[in-house]
UniProtKB/Swiss-Prot annotation:
<keyword id="KW-0004">4Fe-4S</keyword>
<feature type="binding site">
    <location>
        <position position="66"/>
    </location>
    <ligand>
        <name>[4Fe-4S] cluster 1</name>
    </ligand>
</feature>
<dbReference type="GO" id="GO:0048038">
    <property type="term" value="F:quinone binding"/>
</dbReference>
<keyword id="KW-0520">NAD</keyword>
<feature type="binding site">
    <location>
        <position position="102"/>
    </location>
    <ligand>
        <name>[4Fe-4S] cluster 2</name>
    </ligand>
</feature>
<keyword id="KW-0411">Iron-sulfur</keyword>
<dbReference type="GO" id="GO:0050136">
    <property type="term" value="F:NADH:ubiquinone reductase (non-electrogenic) activity"/>
</dbReference>
<dbReference type="GO" id="GO:0051539">
    <property type="term" value="F:4 iron, 4 sulfur cluster binding"/>
</dbReference>
<dbReference type="InterPro" id="IPR017896">
    <property type="entry name" value="4Fe4S_Fe-S-bd"/>
</dbReference>
<dbReference type="Pfam" id="PF12838">
    <property type="entry name" value="Fer4_7"/>
</dbReference>
<feature type="domain" description="4Fe-4S ferredoxin-type 2">
    <location>
        <begin position="90"/>
        <end position="119"/>
    </location>
</feature>
<keyword id="KW-0997">Cell inner membrane</keyword>
<keyword id="KW-0472">Membrane</keyword>
<keyword id="KW-1003">Cell membrane</keyword>
<feature type="binding site">
    <location>
        <position position="105"/>
    </location>
    <ligand>
        <name>[4Fe-4S] cluster 2</name>
    </ligand>
</feature>
<feature type="binding site">
    <location>
        <position position="70"/>
    </location>
    <ligand>
        <name>[4Fe-4S] cluster 2</name>
    </ligand>
</feature>
<keyword id="KW-0677">Repeat</keyword>
Length: 180
């Protein structure tokens, strides 16, 4: 090692110390997380919840599209039917230890039952505690779409109404009446 190389090494070290010392007077970029709350961006995809209709019924019709759309297969559900013919999930289970929070289940849901919230604090000590059942996922409100009711929009008979009598729905067309 020559004297020239030693001088260059010392100069580089002193320059690095100078640059680091100048950063001591700048504003910190790091936030002290538990003390300072973190505000995620508006389209942040966090914890998954199941919402209800404005009437208070479950929105989920157990169509299984969310489970099919999930790339890591963390959603499982079983369909059941009420006496009036309405479908609902008998059980709905999400394994959050496998979930990658991609949001494909929310996009696939035709009833807007699945919605992603900005909650991100889901740490647990046991992996079994990250498996959420329907009772854990179901919230009391309608979520992002307060006025939407799938059965009213889809035209399924509600409380004795026939097809065509629901909100924003036309009467069924008689195809035989169109023939010459």
């Amino acid at each position: 090692m020559t004297l020239k190389e030693l001088a260059i090494g010392c100069g580089t070290t002193l320059r690095s110390i100078w640059m680091i010392g100048m950063q001591a007077f700048n504003k910190r970029e790091t936030r002290m997380y538990p003390d300072v709350p973190v505000n995620p961006p508006p389209r942040f995809r966090g914890r998954i919840v199941l919402t209800r209709d404005p009437d208070g019924d479950e929105r989920c019709v157990a169509c299984n599209l969310c489970a099919v759309a999930c790339p890591v297969d963390c959603i499982s559900l079983q369909k059941a039917e009420t006496k009036d013919g309405r479908w609902y999930p008998e059980f709905f289970r999400i394994n959050f230890s496998r979930c990658i929070f991609c949001g494909l289940c929310e996009e696939a849901c035709p009833t807007t039952a699945i919605q992603l919230t900005p909650d991100f604090e889901m740490g647990e000590f046991k992996r079994q505690d990250l498996v959420y059942e329907k009772d854990d996922l179901l919230i009391s409100g309608p979520g992002k779409y307060p006025e939407y009711n799938f059965y009213r929009m889809a035209g399924m008979a509600i409380a004795g109404k026939d097809k065509g009598e629901a909100e924003n729905e036309a009467k069924p067309i008689d195809v035989k009446g169109l023939l010459p």
